[in-house]
């Protein structure tokens, strides 16, 4: 075969690559000449041969290594490589490191949950005036707990208690001078400037371990435990401004629907109080035409970009008259504060307001503050009576069957702030006082409260208020003729507001034969499928 033919033959080419390797071989019994690709003209074929051999070597090495790896036992999970892999995986999944060297900062871990807010974490700032101090201080003594709470009463002038300290009161202080701030409202009073700075002045005292600053007036009555319960539901490390509106629609229009009314009280978290203290003096100069203190605070909150967080337990009570309709249909929320107690009628007829408050605080508030004034609705089926229990305050009985939808709506036993009987002037739903003399409610006010250690139950008694009533022609049992007192049994439930909001249920108990003219009832958490309806007896 000729060299040119060999170059064109595929079999010759393959043999050369896999066998000859560029050496001489025998052909037809004779020694052939030097192989064709060793010549100068076939240099590319020589390079291809070397490269192909190198790839073949790598391929064999790869198969050998893979076979050795698969045939060997798996490494233990305690190996260093596995630990490092686990650390990386945990860091990606949880954004935290399981293990880190001292020289390497760990990834940021979630902040631990703080403990529940307690009274020790709250500082009160109470606005007061020397002119009304002698009367208003009695309200503060009702709810203040000297050894459990921290706070200050900020006055405009010196009062005698500053010299001879009263241990039943908070520390008394004189507010700072505000004459440098402009005030141009024609009908207002410059004291609004002083009062608006109470939170900032209290913050600057530098008290330790403060989570919340709570503002109120000297005629504001707080329920401290309920206040702590409410504030515990918020993260005190965030900027919060918590309070409620006026009951008067016109008041909210004149001032703001975004403002917490100071008389009802409001709470400012510590970080927000710090921000307010830094900017408030500059802020006050920009609003000389505002009327009061609370609208000035809201103006500064607007500049800080913090909205009002509303809570229905703070009560401004911009109303006149009797609070019965409001208190017997309280929202399903803890009662936090009461205000304008000098303006409205005493909570219990025939008593001073301070005495009425002391009765509630000495009994129901002490026994079960979470349930105070909470409404329960049930029916006396045999007599067709509708019953509403405002626990710790009053029980109302109405002849006839009223739906829960009606009974949870406040009766207008009060007038709005502008002394008009206009139901459109309220910022909530109300219902009129019954015109039918037969449907005028019978009111049983709190008479006593105690705790039964044997049954671990609170026992509250409510006595009928005797009054002249119009003639009723209904052939239906008269509650005043059959029931003088109503006894309500209720187990304390401090965790009431840790659950989803729901009215408690009440149940009429069988009457004891030896106790005539008494009706016994039970109030507590609703049972499964229990609703307020006229049942069978």
Predicted regions and their residues:
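Conserved nucleotide-sugar donor-binding
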Residues: 223, 261-280
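Active-site-proximal specificity loops/subdomain of glycosyltransferases
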Residues: 154-211, 225
